Amino acid sequence: MTEQNLLSSLAHMISEQRNPNSMNLDSLSPLELVTLINNEDKQVPLAIEKVLPQIAQAVEKIVRTFQQGGRLVYIGAGTSGRLGVLDASECPPTYGVKPEMVVGLIAGGERALRHPIEGAEDNAEQGKADLQQINFSKKDILVGIAASGRTPYVIGALNYAKSLGAITISIASNPDSAMASIADIAIDTLVGAEVLTGSSRMKSGTAQKLVLNMLTTASMVLMGKCYQNLMVDVQASNEKLRARAIRIVMQATDCEKEVAERFLKAADNNAKLAIMMVLTNLDKQQASVLLQRHQGKLSRALSQ
């Protein structure tokens, strides 16, 4: 794209407009600044509320993908890419899933998580190449993230995924974007102009984070990764999470700390299995078989 064409494109993007509420930004006091930012941030959940049906549709597709052995892959550049990597990295400790179940890719690779990589987002072919590097297939589902909706790296990845027959989802902060025209499901979080003109790490980034939270949380809940509202598949990999696992067993079964610790030890620190054992008086093997029979969904297993 020529510089003139890019300037014309940016001029029409909501995320690149000047916000009339912040025209005097450089003359505000600290309290006035943070009050303004906070007031603008209040628009984010309202914008997301308008696309909840599309988010729910995406969750249904993600769950079906997981059930069929596929992966959820996020791809983006800059803030968008970092948020995808962040959400993906939280899934193993929270839900006890393998790291490859939810994958985050960022333009420029690992170094781009901490440092800007010049020109990385402009390479559409690299988006395709990065998917090929992880053996992306039509069994997987791709979520392309970019506030602008036009990032070449993400568009290249979406086009490649589409060519394979994979389901594609876009998350953007501008309407009628190039990404939305490619994706099977377009999630357009129209949060309006940023307080600092063009700084899409702000409201647009906040909207992306909230949507990603919804996608993985709702999908994992539907996959049986929680009981009531407890993260029963938590991996007790550090002191805080070990304490949380004990509390989860206590909360789910109304047992004492010593009982929770004893059953967790018998269940190899598997909180879900420990809860099953406490509530049913089954041994580890019997409880495990019953859980497997119900696809790991504790509520269903307990109802038998």
From Swiss-Prot:
SUPFAM superfamilies: SIS domain (SSF53697). The keyword Transport does not apply. Residues 62-225 form the SIS domain. Pathway: Amino-sugar metabolism; 1,6-anhydro-N-acetylmuramate degradation; Amino-sugar metabolism; N-acetylmuramate degradation; Cell wall biogenesis; peptidoglycan recycling. One of its GO terms (molecular function) is carbohydrate derivative binding. Its EC number is 4.2.1.126. Belongs to the GCKR-like family. MurNAc-6-P etherase subfamily. NCBIfam families: N-acetylmuramic acid 6-phosphate etherase (TIGR00274), PRK05441.1 (NF003915), PRK12570.1 (NF009222). This is N-acetylmuramic acid 6-phosphate etherase.
